[in-house]
């Protein structure tokens, strides 16, 4: 009887250990899944920073940096970025914002301006492994435009490309149409899943946006697109995040962040999930 009881106790202990081991494995599997999901989720912010000036007319980069930091993006496309211009006090806006947000900065010149340079910026939580600055077509006499690209590696090990741009603001939309066509021609041949973000100065349904959406998938609500400009009373949707190819990305969340002091534009935050092949 004692032998049988001892045997039963041993079996019971083995069952308990087995169950505990199974629970541990299940928890580890869930944690691994959560980690995997977080590793392939990318938060993108598009932000026209009004050449570093607030809507009050002063230069307060801490206000702009706070909007970015509070949004906690992985990659930021900055538009209207000054480098060493007279009006911004001869500072490097991209680098200064990078310092304040603890992100790697990148600047791409669209034109020489006011004793310095003016163009696009990118901030990134990840190291740049390749960058390029692509001039976009424009009508002589109009403002030159560019598209700035950075290739980065995510914590998951996946490589993606990120492009920030700022299309022409004038009418007719001749330059915007040409710029949309150039972006399609240049960047959709990327060997990596790619994200496009920026102030496109065009509303949903316009010709430039239709051209882009022939190839790119947009993140905004097609039925009720949320306006992003001006920041004090938004009524126009002109800031975008798009991605390509469509089957590699899923839009998880979008958010328009309006700080009426930091800039005349709202910031546009989009959370994307990179899907496996």
What annotation goes with each model-predicted range?
Residues 154-174:
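Metal-dependent phosphoester/phosphodiester hydrolase catalytic core
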Residues 35, 41, 56-57, 75, ...:
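Structured beta-strand-rich core segments of catalytic domains in phosphoester-bond hydrolases
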Residues 51-58, 132, 173, 228-229:
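Short, solvent-exposed loop/turn elements at domain surfaces
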Residues 56-63, 89, 142-144, 175-182, ...:
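Soluble or luminal CAZymes and related metallo-dependent hydrolases
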Residues 85-90, 103-122, 141-144, 191, ...:
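Active site of divalent-metal-dependent phosphoester/diester hydrolases
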Residues 8, 14, 19, 23, ...:
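N-terminal, active-site-proximal structural segment of metallo-dependent hydrolase catalytic domains
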Residues 42-49, 64-88, 150, 161-165, ...:
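Active-site beta-strand/loop signature of hydrolases that rely on acidic residues for catalysis
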Residues 47-50, 79-81, 108-111, 124-126, ...:
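Active-site-proximal beta-strand/loop segments in catalytic clefts of secreted hydrolases
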